[in-house]
Amino acid sequence: ELRLGDGLSVLSAGEVGTIVLAGVSAQTTWEIIEQAPWVMQPGGPRLVLVPATRHSELRRWLWAHGFALAADRPVQAAGRWYAVMAAEYTGERKEASFTECLFGRTDEWPEGAGYAAWQKAKLPRFRLGVPDGTALAEEIDALLESSPSQAASRPALSKGEPLA
């Protein structure tokens, strides 16, 4: 069945088990989700998300709105890195650090080191817009001084285990 509509407006709760949103910005992705409140319910559909831009901002939004990342895999295509995220609504909100949002769970995959290096290479330019003496500036400076593998490292998790 083919339906024409805006975002998820043509669907209702219980009609689908998985929703794929790919190739749009992080902001467009979360706006589509926000317009379908039935997605943000326990037992709701699994989301497979591939934001074209601002992966870290989408991770922050997901965690802040009660989603857990069941998977977060980096994929390189045409010289550009993408993050393929599988998210499920749990209702447990998480305030994540800049580092967690920047790298997500990508260190669980062989491609994680390349993704971390790509993310880290963008930090000097981003740092220019962050005021000195702030916690964010200190976190970015520490990342810039670390190796890519150290930057993305965190306590090991089993695949599919949400960040606590």
Language-model region placement:
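Class I S-adenosyl-L-methionine
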Residues: L8-V10, E15-L21, Q27-A164
